[in-house]
Amino acid sequence: MRKIFTLFFCAASLATGLAQQESYFTNPVIHGDVADPSIIRIDQTYYITGTSSEWAPYYPVFTSTDLVNWQQTGHVFDEKPEWTKSSFWAPEWYQHKGKVYVYYTARKQSDNISCIGVAVADSPTGKFKDYGPVVEFGKEAIDAFILEDKGKLYISWKAYGLDNQPIELLACKLTDDGLRLDGKPFSLLRDDERQGMEGQHWFKKDGYYYIIYSVRGCCGPQSDYAVSVARSKKLEGPYEKYQGNPILHGSKEVLSIGHGTITTTPDGRMYYLCHAYQPGSGFYQGRQPYLQEVRMGEDHWPHFVTGEYASRTQPMPFAESAQVPVFDFSDDFTGATLRPEWSWNYPYTDVKTEIKNGKLSLSGTPKPGVKTGAALCLRPTSPDYTLETAIVNRNDSWKGITMYGDANNLITCGCAGDRLILKYILELSLIHISEPTRLRCIS
């Protein structure tokens, strides 16, 4: 068996094992960097997609029947839509007239401005047909969310994030097919506090329209992301911000948390899926999906069942289910195609793969100025890990394993011809080598 364990440094994940009891589970529910997650239920099956940033394929897709145990099945796009360039962020599911829509953020080839595109398929795991940009607004339009009200579709998004003015959550009616704007945009909510505002979930319940949105800093070691809420009796507002905001924020075991969407169980319970950073070494696992139950209080505001401080330990959504432990990843390359867990950093190298007779052939053409080769990557399941691979060393090309952040931040170990090579490139100083590195060569 030939195994390849390759990882990317910025998107690791934590192995949590079994939940403490059968009636509880431990967040994250997906191990690895899947930021800005969107969740939808179709019949008895739940589907997640999320940000893929500069990694291909684009927007990973996961499925589950119990909200806790997830399996990656593929991606929304195997190839980039023609109009897009980079920054594949915040996809949002929506089901309409028997079709599944995904509204996603990407930068345009023409001017590098982030806008919102739309694609349609028969199911979340089907082949999506892209219909191009649906929202182009100023310097940036990101973080789409769809609401149907009185038979009409409305799209909301974050605007003015790159302007010298308060961020606003804007909205506009869509055409009946959900593919184009129909009318003029209007403002839902404004960030007068200048603390940040994005990642909204917009819904109607018990006579109110609610916007659950994220505030403060989304990303990085100083992230203090949190979740707030506003409500209105009218779709177009004005929206009243909850005096007790934020309703969900970090804790001793969660650095920061936010940007999510709500799904409902068949019996009507509401679960909010968002992303969170973990403190300490877990931070480098990236923004991982967290699941928390939310209920409407007697005050007609939504509240999280386990309180405003984010908690990794949560009650199981379904008593008959139990959280399955995370197993080590291995691949013997006996399938006809690559497993969906694999990805590559597309801005730096065009990756080509061939699987034949239990072997993977990996090659690629680096972009101008890039000094590294092709890297096929996956998210590990712990901040501490062992990597092992068997390679066929038949030429002078470099081959081996890598800890990979991007082409400017990596550690590699492998061989070329009769040479055993260990090298690293560190631009961001995020990798610290505190102990001597040991190499073992098995002939």
Positions of the model-derived regions?
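Extracellular glycan-recognition surfaces and repeat-rich motifs
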Residues: L338-L362
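Residue-level detector of conserved catalytic or cofactor/ligand-binding positions
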Residues: S429-I442
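Secretory/extracellular carbohydrate-interaction modules
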Residues: P366-I421
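Hydrophobic core segments of beta-strands in well-ordered, beta-rich domains
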Residues: V29, A35-W55, G74, W89-Q109, ...
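Blade-edge beta-strand/turn elements of extracellular beta-propeller
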Residues: Q21-I30, N69-P81, D122-F137, K173-Q195, ...
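Beta-propeller blade signature
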Residues: T63-S64, G117-S123, L170-T175, V227-K234, ...
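Loop/turn-rich, solvent-exposed surfaces of beta-rich toroidal or solenoidal domains
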Residues: R194-E240, L255
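Extracellular carbohydrate-recognition regions
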Residues: E308-E341
